[in-house]
Amino acid sequence: MRRIFLFTGLMISMLSASAQTSVETRRQYLSGHGCDDMVKWNFKCTDGQNSGKWTTIGVPSCWELQGFGTYQYGMRFYGIPKPEGIANEKGYYKYDFYLPAEWQGNQIQLVFEAVMTDAKVKINGRKAGNGLHQGGFYRFVYDVTDRIFFGKHKNTIEVEVSKESENSQVNMAERRADYWNFGGIIRPVFVVAKPVYNIDRVAIDAKMDGRFTADCFLSRGLQAGGKIKTEIVDSKGKVVASNISEVRGNDQTLVDFKVNHPSLWTAETPNLYTAVFTLQDNTGKILHRERQKFGFRTIEYRQHDGVYINGKKVIFKGVNRHSFRPESGRTLSKAKNIEDVKLIKSMNMNAVRLSHYPADPEFLEACDSLGLYVESELSGWHWAHTTIIGQQLVKEMVTRDQNHPSIIFWSNGNEGGFNYELDSEFGRWDKQNRVVLYPWANRNGFETKHYRSWGETLEYMRQPEIFMPTEFLHGLYDGGHGAGLKDYWQIMMHNPRCAGGFLWDLADEGVVRTDLNNIVDCVGNFGADGIVGPHFEKEGSYYTIKEVWSPVQVSASVQGKDIAYTLRNTYNFVNLKDCKFTYRCLELPSWGNSQVKVLKKGNLEAPHVEPGDSSVVVLKNIPASTSAVELTAVDHHGDTIMTWSTKVQPSAAVNSAVASEVSTSETVDELLVKAGERTYYYSKKNGRLEKVMVGGRTISLSNGPRFVAAKRSDRSFDQFYNHDDQDAEKKKTQYTEYVDQGAFHGMTWLDTAAGKTLRVSYDYGTLHHVDYIFQKDGSVRMQAEYDFNGVVDLMGIAFDYPESKVKSKAWVGQGPYRVWQNRLDGPQYGYWQNAYNDPIPGESWEYPEFKGYFAQVDWMQLTTEEGKIGIKAIQNASNIGVYQPRDGRDHILYELPATGISILQVIPAVRNKVNTTDLNGPSAQPYWSTSSKTVVVDLKFD
C-alpha cells in the first residue's frame, strides 16, 4: 500500500513539473454556444436537400433548418417502428481544432450536449468512447485524454450522425411523436480540461434548515490525508460558511455541514448560492477546484395532500414547453432560453414541464435564477426506451441536472411511454430522491390524467391521490388555455388534494421550411397548440392566464367618488407589502374620438397581506369625469404582475333621444328617410335597412336589423344530445342557425315622447318591431324588441356589411383582444383600435384579431372605404360581433354562422381540441332564453 501511495505522489510531482496545470476546470467550445453563434464545420448529408456533397454547416443546428435533408413530422409514422418513406438521412461532420499546449497533462473530455439521434464519434481517427451514443436529447461525455494533441498539432473530430436510430425502440420513444423530427448536432460541442486528480461531479442536497450535503465523485482514488474544502458563497460573493472533509482513500467523499440561516430558494424567491469545492492532497496542495450553483430548499411530497416546499403547500401554475424556434428548431441559445423563462413568468406562471425531453442547461439555469418550478422528463412520447438504453439516458439526464433547485419532479416518459424498470434508476442517481411522475397515469401518489372535462376533473379529484394534470385545456388555435381556465381553476383550488396543473402548450411549433420558400409550417392542427405563436405572438389566452393566475387577485367596487379594491394574496411566500401598486384615473374618448386623458395618477400604499389573506385598499376622490381607473401591481422583482381596469361610468354619455326634422320619399321598393345630410333606405319587402347615403356617398350597411340565433349542431334546442344521430360527431364543430319565421307587417310613424319615430313591425316571429328615432346629432337611435324561447349559443341582431371594405375599428370596451363566453377575463376596459386583419390560425399570426366578439363595449366605430359606421350601446348591447372568428384550415374547433356586424346578448363559448364546448365548465354552457329582450343602440354614419 505504501508503494502505491509513493507512486501516486511521484506521478503528481511529474505532472506538475511537466506542465503548468491550472486547478480550474477549463472549457473550449468546438461549436458555437447555440443558434446565435454557430461555428462552421465540414459537412455532407446523404439524402434530401443539398445532399451527396461536402460543404459546410453551422454547429450546433438542426440540419433541416440549414437547408439539408428532409423535413418530417413524427405523427405521420405514429406507431410504426420501421415505416416506408421515413426520412433516414445521415450527416457526416468534420472539424479541425487545436488545444492549448498548457493543457497537456490534464484529463481531456469531449462533451456533446445533444446529437439527434445516433452518434458515432472519432477523434484523430480513433473511436471515442464505446463508439455509439443513442438518444437525441442527452449530454454524453468521452474521455479522450489518450487521443488528443496539444499546441500546434492539429486535432480532427469526425461525427457520423444518423437521423433515425439503429435501435427501433429509440425511434418509437423519441421520433414517432406529435412534434417535428430533426437531425444533427443540435446542441454545443466542447472540450473540458481538468487536472488528472479532479472532482468529476458533485451531487448536492441543501435543505431549508441549512444542512448541506454533497457527494463528491473523484476521477480516481486519492491517497489518505487528502481533503475537500467546501465554501458556500452567496450572490454578493461573500463566503457564508465553509467546511473541510477528509478524502478517505477512495473516489467518493461525503460533505456534510450546516449553514446558518440561509436565504431559501423558491420560484418566488430564487435565492442561489455557489458551492466552491477545492480538492487538496495530503500536503495541502490544491489539485482541482469545482464550482456548482444550488439553492437551499426542502421538497415534501405529502401523501393524499400535496407538494410542500420549505414547509408551505405549493400550487403549480404551469405550462408544457418545447425547446423550439422556427428558424433553428430544437437548437437554441442562452438568450433564447432566458426569453422562454421570462415569457412563462410574464403570464404569472410558476412552473414548466419539459415536454418531452430534457432541456438545455441554460434553460434550467434561467429557471434557477429567475424562479420556475420544473418537471424534467425522460423521452418516451407514447413508447418507452429499452431498459439498457433507458438506464444510460436516465443517468445522463439526472447526473447533469440534479443540482438545479428548480427541478421538483422527474417524469418517466409520457402518456404510456413508460418503462417501469427505470423507476428506481432516478433515485440511484438523484441524491435528492425527487418523486418520479408518469404523465397521464396514476402512480407514485400523483394522478396526472390529461385532458379531462370539467365534470371528469371533479370526479378525478375525489380520488385519494394528489391531482395534478400534466396536460390540460389543449390550446389548439384559439381554443382551450384561457377558455375554461377560470372554471377549472375554481374547482381545482377548492380541492385540498389538487397541486395545480400544466397547460398544453407554450408556443405554436411552426418551423421555417427552407424547402418551401421559408413558410412557417405547423402541419395543420398538429403544431398550432400554443398560447403564443411561433415568434411569441400573443394570443388572447395569454392575457386570460395572466389574470386568472395572477398572484394578486383583485376585485373592485365603485363607491361614489372612491374605489375599494379587495386584494387577495395567492402567493405562497411573498407578502403584498413587498409589491408596489400604482393607479391612473382615465377619461376615455367619447364616441368617435381618440384622446385618452390621464386625470390623476399615483401610488397606493401596499398593504401587509400574508399569503392566503386579503385586505381592502381604498382609492379616494376620483375625478368626476373619470371613465376608468387602472390599477397596476408590480412584484418584488420589479416585474409587472397585472394591470386591471375598472369601469366607473360610460365613456359616451347616454342622452335621451331627441328627434330631428325628417323628410320621406318612396320608390316602388324602398322607403327613404332623410335626416340632415343622411338618407336611410328601408326595404318595403322586409323592413330592413338597405343602405345609408351620406353626402352623396353610399355606406352599405344592410340586411338588418335581423334576429340571429345559433346552437351547436350536436344538440337540440331543448339541450338534449341526440345519441342516435350518427352524424353527431362531425356536428360538434358546426352550428345550426335559427331562421326567424316572422312576416313583415309594415312601417308606420309614431308620435313618442322623443318625437317622430319610425316603427317597423313583424308578425308571428321572433323579432316584434324595430323603432328608429332620427336624432339631431346626426345619429339614429334604434330599438329592437325580440322574444325567443330556447337554448342558444349565440343570439342577438345583425347587419351585413362587405368585409372587403372594412379598414379598421376603434372602440371603448374590453380589449384589445376578442372574448369568448368562457374566456371573458384578460381583456381590460379601455380605448382600443386596430387595423383589419384576418389571420388563419396555425398559418398566420397577426394579433389582436380584428374579427370576433367584443365585450363591455360603450361604443365602436368601423372605418371603411365608404366612410365610418358608429355603434353606441344604450341597452342590452354591450357585446359587439365583428364578423365571425376564423378557424384553422382543419375546422377542428368551430364553423360559426356568418353574422356580419352584430349586437349580441349571447356570444359563443369555445371548445378545445379534446373536449367539446359544453364539457369545459359552467361558463361554456348554452343560454336558455325565456323572455323578450329589448336592444337599444345609437347608429351614426359619417
Give residue spans per PLM region.
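Extended carbohydrate-recognition surfaces in non-catalytic/accessory domains of CAZymes
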Residues: 20-111, 132, 165-178, 182-185, ...
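Accessory beta-strand-rich segments of carbohydrate-active enzymes
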Residues: 23-27, 44-48, 88-199, 235, ...
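An acidic-aromatic loop/edge-strand motif
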Residues: 25, 62-65, 70, 74-79, ...
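Substrate-binding clefts and catalytic carboxylate motifs of secreted carbohydrate-active enzymes
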Residues: 33-52, 57-59, 63-66, 88, ...
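Beta-strand/loop-rich accessory regions of lumenal/periplasmic or secreted enzymes
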Residues: 65, 114, 163, 266, ...
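Active-site-adjacent substrate/metal-binding segments within catalytic domains
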Residues: 66-123, 128-135, 192-205, 213, ...
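Beta-strand-rich binding/interaction modules
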Residues: 121-123, 211-246, 253-255, 275, ...
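Substrate-binding/catalytic cleft of secreted carbohydrate-active enzymes
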Residues: 341-344, 351-540
